[in-house]
Regions:
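Conserved, carboxylate-rich catalytic/transport cores that coordinate ions
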Residues: 1-6, 18-21, 25-32, 264, ...
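Long, charged N-terminal accessory/stalk domains
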Residues: 1-343, 373, 377-384
């Protein structure tokens, strides 16, 4: 059922805006829209977005230290009251500040350690040099250079000495072997030219009053201090991470505050107002909620205008509501539509899904495995429930067709598809005819409700009669009746099919309509042969898995070792094969069943085009807000 909507305009004093919007968010009764002329948002929006981002960063950082063991069994979200959720907490904000400071400090320490280690590594080749860096400089009579010579040229060092230089050789580093070359000023050009020919690369050491070993020791101590501080900061972060639940609550609080500040409103000097939608049956409850905050407010409600499209909210029973996800993936119903397609579509989807699976064993697996998954993970998503409920349909059709994990453990109630393919095809096409007829019947109902009775009779009913008559021609007992129905319906279509056209189209339009009916419905009916195809493919693969498992199973001639290996191999092939086949069949049934609903069924009457009803409500990820009817006293 599509829930009727009312257009709401709420007027109140400017000073009451924040408490009123909090009350609307608390009750979740009104969807506020951004269509008001001159609308604006709360000035604190950017600030609240920044706060949410900060909490998110702190939560992410704390998560790296939290000692939380993830269980495959998901726990239910903690339930909190809205007022508790929105209560300010100075302590939690201080925790966020401290965590972000620790994160920044750890990042700085990490960069400092990298820099220190790079400096220490650069000094390592010079540790054996017992000269302070500030003493390495030119004099009036000599020139000195420090640098590296590639290790492969070290045997040619005498060439530098022959040119008049003195070479001090130290340890090897990444660039090469560390050397210090001293030469008399008169011979320096020749000496350094000889060094360059050996690949000498000059390095300017820092002018500090330390030897390389002394500076290296200082850097090592500095790195140890930073590492110690880092360990202390990480320990503190681990302690603070024990407050991760408080941080999660704070994140939900800030997210809810952001959503509140995103609300569009307009205002004058003294009054503010918002526009939106609410359920028609919740207007009184909305008015009571507003009066809890202030008596100086006015709630104006009215039916939607012809040029307005309200949001869509569907309300169906527990089972049918799960299949709304299938419709929504096609297009959400338009609230101005006469009918909600979900009830009829959901029943057909359930029936056809079970036929496509067509195996009682697989249906039982769907019920047990998906039911267990729902229980353990607390996942109550619509797609999960569709598979769970379709398991019962699969069991039913599996019993009808006598298929149990690809074997005929019990006689089929109707027939075995593999033994009588043509009859099974006829059943599948028959299901298709009924499915299509139900879509045409929905269109008939819409035409009657919207004041087009002749369209319902001359277009929709005539199509049903024509197809029914043509199908009767295949029965000897009903052939004569089928001829009469076919002739009458063809005549009606030809004579009335062009009634909306002008000129010659009134006479030729009927023939075109007749062709479209025969070709369109004929092609649509043949589309249901895919039910048989999926049924057979799943059954054959299941049989193959059974045969493969049976081939490796031990027999009377198997030894002890062969018996153990054969039994384990057979069981593995059986389990893995059937699980793989089940998953593949589920995917195929989901896709092809959806296709039949979208094209063959919805194509007869449904267009959609709606958008979801999303009332202002708390935006939470980690906790669940308790639903309390605060408006009621």
């Amino acid at each position: 059922m599509i829930v009727p909507m009312k257009k709401i305009t709420l007027y109140a004093m400017k000073r009451e805006r924040k408490p009123l919007l909090r009350q609307l968010q608390k009750t979740g009764l009104m969807m506020i829209i951004d269509e008001t002329e001159g609308a604006k948002r709360d000035d604190n929006l950017k600030h609240s977005e920044a706060d949410r981002a900060r909490v998110g960063e702190a939560l992410k950082f704390a998560g790296g230290f939290a000692q939380i063991k993830k269980s495959p069994i998901a726990a239910e979200k903690d339930k909190v009251d809205y007022d508790f959720l929105m209560a300010q907490s100075t302590a939690d904000n201080e925790t966020v500040d401290r965590l972000l400071w620790i994160r920044e400090k750890l990042q700085i320490n990490e960069q400092n350690l990298i820099s220190i280690n790079e400096k220490a590594d650069a000094l390592t080749p010079w540790l054996d040099m017992n000269v302070s860096f500030d003493e390495i400089e030119d004099t009036k009579l000599s020139k000195v250079k420090t640098g590296y010579i590639p290790e492969r040229h070290m045997s040619k060092i005498p060439e530098i000495e022959q040119a008049g230089g003195v070479v001090g050789v130290y340890s090897s580093g990444k660039p090469g072997v560390a050397v210090m070359i001293v030469a008399h000023c008169s011979e320096s050009n020749a000496v350094f030219e000889a060094a360059q020919q050996l690949g000498f690369t000059e390095v300017h050491l820092p002018k500090e009053p330390f030897t390389a070993a002394e500076r290296h020791r200082e850097l090592t101590l500095e790195a140890e201090e930073i590492s110690k501080e880092t360990d202390e900061l990480k320990a503190e972060a681990e302690t603070l991470s024990k407050k991760i639940e408080e941080l999660q609550l704070l994140h939900d609080r800030e997210s809810t505050r952001v959503k509140l500040n995103e609300v569009s409103f307009a205002e004058t000097d003294n009054v503010f107002y918002v526009e939106g939608w609410t359920r028609a049956d919740k207007v009184d409850e909305l008015e009571k909620a507003v009066k809890k905050v202030t008596d100086l407010a006015y709630v104006e409600s009215r039916d939607p205008n012809d040029d307005e499209k309200p949001p869509t909210l569907t309300e169906n029973n527990k089972i049918i509501s799960q299949f709304e996800a299938i419709t929504d993936m096609f297009s959400r119903p338009d609230p101005r539509d006469v009918v909600d397609p979900n009830t009829v579509m959901g029943i057909w989807y359930w029936i056809i899904f079970g036929m496509m699976m067509g195996d009682a064993g697989y249906g039982l697996m769907m019920i047990v495995l998906v039911g267990g998954f729902k229980l353990l993970t607390k996942n109550n998503g619509k797609l999960v429930n569709i598979i769970f409920y379709s398991g019962f349909s699969t069991v039913f059709w599996g019993i009808m067709f006598g298929s149990y994990f690809g074997e005929s453990l019990f006689p089929a109630v109707i027939l075995s598809p593999l033994d009588d393919i043509m009859t099974t095809l006829g059943i599948c096409l028959g299901i298709g005819v009924l499915h299509i007829f139900s879509g045409i019947a929905m269109k008939m109902y819409i035409d009657f409700k919207e004041g087009r009775p002749w369209d319902a009779i001359l277009d929709q009913l005539t199509s049903i009669v024509l197809v029914t008559g043509l199908l009767m021609l295949f029965s000897e007992k009903l052939k004569s009746v089928g001829k009469i129905l076919s002739i009458i319906s063809v005549a009606v279509i030809i004579l009335t099919g062009g009634r909306t056209k002008k000129g010659i189209g009134k006479f030729t339009g009927g023939f075109l309509v007749l062709y479209n009916v025969l070709a369109g419905l004929g092609g649509d009916i043949l589309s249901y042969a895919r039910i048989l195809a999926l049924m057979l493919s799943g059954g054959i693969v299941a049989m193959v898995m059974n045969i493969l498992a049976g081939m490796v199973m031990p027999n009377a001639n198997s030894g002890v070792f062969g018996w153990i290996i054969g039994l384990i191999s057979g069981i593995l092939i059986y389990i893995i094969g059937h699980v793989f086949n089940l998953v593949l069949n589920l995917l195929s049934a989901y896709v092809h069943d959806s296709r039949l609903q979208y094209l063959e069924f919805f194509g007869k009457f449904y267009e959609g085009g709606g958008y979801a009803f999303k009332p202002l409500s708390p935006d939470t990820k980690y906790v669940a807000v308790e639903e309390k009817k605060e408006a009621e006293q």
